[in-house]
Amino acid sequence: MEDFKMKTLAAFLSLLVLCWAQEEAKLTKANNRFGLRLLRALPSGPEKNVFFSPYSVSAAMGMAFAGARGQTQQELSQGLGFSDVDLTDAGVLDAYTHHTERLKSTPSNSTLDVANAAAIQRTLALLNSYESALQSSFGAELHKVDFAGEPQAAVDFVNNWVKRKTHDKIEKLFNEPLDPDTLLVLLNAIYFKGEWNTAFVKEHTEKRQFFNGGVTPVEVDTMRLEARIKYRFFDDLQVEVVELPYRGLDYTMAILLPKENTGVEGLKQNLTVDRFQNYLSDLRERKITVLLPKFKLETKYSLKAPLQSLGIKQIFESGADLSGINDERLRVSAVEHKAVVEVNEEGTVAAATTGVVIVPYSLGPEPVVFRVDHPFLFFIRNTRTDDIFFVGQVNKL
């Protein structure tokens, strides 16, 4: 009888692990789909680069989702892609719980630090259930501040938290004190540092042409690497794809270079998560020469309008239902996102932070030259979990 009990328990635990893995995979797919949709919604053009962390935005909005109810929660579920992958409301929080723990516990040769926090007006009492969700599902730190009485000290606290969690790569998220009526700021910060598995040799870096906007030639520092790397050209979107691994091989940078100099916008509009994943699965290792510009991007976005264009609307209006946070009538007034990335011969350093402000109411024998000399897309991802942590579009250098 005891032997039967043990077998039953083991089977039950295995089933739980399988369910958790399935929920995490759904969350990753939802976040990645959301990232591509947000990429299309953000302003871009020949003179404007794009860089952001879909994971950071999704995590911050996920903390708002935990306190949303009714239509507000439904819009978030649809806009963030949860409903598209059949994630239930409870399933979202369970998936975040186990995914957050796995990212923290998985050993890696690269550095990935993800942190969540809530800066809470000291007079605001959060519902116990919401505090529990923030801490258990997101590992969030809870901090009391005084946006009304000590606005400068409050914003300084938020900015110092951001600076610390991004290893000083982002100095501040907010340039001035927030509205004194602010009751809650939900924060996510993400920092990545990875060394190339095969480093570019500094002595091989030299000035080469890059066509800004696909048409205007400029001379930029361009790195050179000859190695066996995963590569392929895909006819459907007329795009070359290279995947550059970081040391340890658990993180990579995938670079998508359209054949046409001005083809990046069309590529962006037609790229889907499934197509992206299929591209990566179909890559083949071969000897190639990579010519990649060194670059550093710094971006800041107010995400209210882009999120509204994705159908997330009511949370910003007076009729928002955030009754899972507190009994008061609350609404989100702003979603601010800041990101920075630097790519050089050694590797990549990237960081991003999001703040949600809540107020009342083909293979061949010949070597290939992968010449990145015109606008392109890039993605920094985890090969174990398939999470896309950072997305960029380089139009101008």
Curated annotation (Swiss-Prot):
Gene3D superfamilies xref list: Alpha-1-antitrypsin, domain 1, Antithrombin, subunit I, domain 2
Cited PROSITE patterns: SERPIN
Residues of this chain annotated as glycosylated in UniProt: 109, 270
InterPro entries: Serpin_CS (IPR023795), Serpin_dom (IPR023796), Serpin_fam (IPR000215), Serpin_sf (IPR036186), Serpin_sf_1 (IPR042178), Serpin_sf_2 (IPR042185)
Keyword set, alphabetical order: Glycoprotein, Hemostasis impairing toxin, Immunity, Platelet aggregation inhibiting toxin, Protease inhibitor, Secreted, Serine protease inhibitor, Signal, Toxin
GO cellular component: extracellular space
Subcellular locations according to the entry: Secreted
Disulphide linkage map: none
Record's note on what induces expression: Induced by blood feeding.
Superkingdom, natural source: Eukaryota
Pfam families tied to this protein: Serpin
UniProt signal peptide: 1-21
GO molecular function terms listed in the Swiss-Prot or TrEMBL record: serine-type endopeptidase inhibitor activity; toxin activity
Tissues of expression: Female salivary gland. Ovary. Midgut.
GO biological process, one term: immune system process
Protein family according to the UniProt entry: Belongs to the serpin family.
Described purpose of this protein according to its UniProt entry: Serine protease inhibitor that modulates blood feeding of ticks on vertebrate species. Inhibits host trypsin, thrombin (F2), alpha-chymotrypsin, cathepsin G (CTSG) and mast cell chymase (CMA1). Inhibits host cathepsin G- and thrombin-induced platelet aggregation. Inhibits acute inflammation in the host. Suppresses neutrophil recruitment in inflamed area. Does not inhibit host plasmin (PLG), factor Xa (F10), factor XIa (F11), elastase and proteinase 3/myeloblastin (PRTN3). (Microbial infection) Inhibits IL6 production by mouse splenic dendritic cells in response to Borrelia burgdorferi exposure. Decreases levels of STAT3 phosphorylation in mouse splenic dendritic cells in response to Borrelia burgdorferi exposure and in Borrelia-primed CD4+ T-lymphocytes. Inhibits differentiation of mouse Th17 cells, a subset of CD4+ T-lymphocytes that play a crucial role in protection against extracellular bacteria, in response to Borrelia burgdorferi exposure via inhibition of the IL6/STAT3 signaling pathway.
Assembly and oligomerization: Interacts with mouse MCPT4.
Protein known as: Iripin-2
UniProt source species: Ixodes ricinus (Common tick)
Organism lineage: Eukaryota, Metazoa, Ecdysozoa, Arthropoda, Chelicerata
